[in-house]
């Protein structure tokens, strides 16, 4: 029987790619830091630490930009192509959310509200008290919560394919391609090549085909095997008892970006979010793009980010 793990120990494409991203982030003027959010108290009953790429030499005359990732690979993979477009104009911060990359907590709270509170503590620990935010998918949930809880701290926000306005009943009403939440967690946190292939099909309009199982196993072993149950709890927490009527309306100027053919969070959720926020929000729908619009239509995605975040500076 073929032992993929033995081969992975000899060479890992995913680990090599991850190393290249680290070099790229470092060359862009960022450094990797893990921050203890337990206030250094050895007697604290819980511990929380967050990893973040932060500026090596922050310029306090520049505005601050917080880039929040979604499920899948770590933050570097999701923003690697766009980073250099912003480091010249912003102090850029790219954290790993809790249970991704090098961030974790012993707290039982799995809500995006708690993620947002930890992020605010992280940013304040680095002397950042006002910022703009880009949130992709799950990162958009956390970013929205940040904007709602700390309105005076957030200037602008970009929400990319973030189904913030979904409701628990949407699953029962058949809005999503998957039949139930359990199946959704198996796809979003793939543990087999078959489930990873499903995730790719759901994420891209034109998914790459014929990827050898070796590469799929490699990605899973490097990116998807840690904190599996905790990540599943994050997904379940999003949907549990969720009602649009309970969602606060944020006041910040907002840009909503959506892939027209998103199969994970259908476009209807983008329009629902626009109606919920109201006149402070504009929506951009990118054609021939799915949920991974930041990767599938990278140049168009970046064009809209720059127009919204930079042109008004």
Each PLM stretch: what is its role?
Residues 252, 266-274:
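Short alpha-helix in the alpha/beta-hydrolase fold that links the catalytic acid
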Residues 2, 168-176, 187-251:
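Conserved alpha/beta-hydrolase catalytic His-Asp/Glu region
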Residues 279-313:
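Catalytic active-site module of serine/aspartate enzymes centered on a nucleophile-bearing elbow/loop
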Residues 144, 148-149, 153-191:
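Flexible "cap/lid" loop of the alpha/beta hydrolase fold
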Residues 250, 256-258, 262:
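Short beta-strand/loop motif that positions the catalytic acidic residue
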Residues 57-59, 84, 93-135, 303:
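Active-site loop/oxyanion-hole signature of alpha/beta-hydrolase fold enzymes
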